[in-house]
Amino acid sequence: MGAVEPSLAYAPLRRLPAQHRSMVRVQRMLDACAELLDEGGYSELSTTRIAERAGVAIGSVYQFFPDKKAITQALGLRYLDQFTARVAERLAEGGREHWTHSADVIIDEYLDMHRTVPGFRSLHFGDVVDERLLDSDTENNRVIATRLRQLLTAHGGAHECEQLDRAVVVAVEAADAVLKLAFRLDPDGDPRLIEETKLLLRTYLGHHFG
């Protein structure tokens, strides 16, 4: 029995891979999906192309996933887990004057994934496919805000409260809007707008909690 990747437990799989070799096949499908997204975007993606790139039979794809959207959802959840783990590790290192400065860490890790993780620059957390790709009951940015709030309280030194919940939602929405503009102006993210995003978050969060 192979260990199931945590993100797959929440993905719309027809069934979870029960053996190590099945898990490896599913991982290859997700890797193939990431590569193809970078090459042609979601509109050019298909289960047939994913199967060909992953080196598996099309029947193997449908054994686990009903369609290409389900595969991108699993990939988006994988990205969310990776992002969460990276931010948690950085926050655990400490060294910040105040937890509101964690905004820099969050933005830096997001940018590094955009530049280095296959498929992330094309999918990010799923809005290009569906604004509720990560969770059919919740908007993607809300899912991200919940994760970040948990990180800030567990590792960053913030205290759980209703005001924090609202502030993190606003911060995520604001950062998302400015970063999308930064990527429209420069494929790697306009450096000036990235710095403005960090300043915006530090100032906003500092106003409420500094």
Named regions from a protein language model:
Residues M1-V24, G210:
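N-terminal intrinsically disordered/low-complexity leader segments
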Residues R25-C33, I50, L75-F83:
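Generic hydrophobic, amphipathic alpha-helix propensity
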Residues R28, L36, G40-A70:
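Helix-turn-helix
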Residues T72-Y79, R86-V87, N140:
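Alpha-helical DNA-contacting segments of helix-turn-helix folds
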Residues A74, A88-R115:
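Hydrophobic alpha-helical connector segments
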Residues R96, T116-L123, E131-L134, R142-V168, ...:
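Hydrophobic alpha-helical bundle segments that form small-molecule/ligand-binding pockets
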Residues T100, D104, D108, R142-R149, ...:
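An amphipathic alpha-helix signature
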Residues S122-G126, L134, A154-L201:
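Hydrophobic/aromatic-rich alpha-helical bundle segments in the mid-to-C-terminal region
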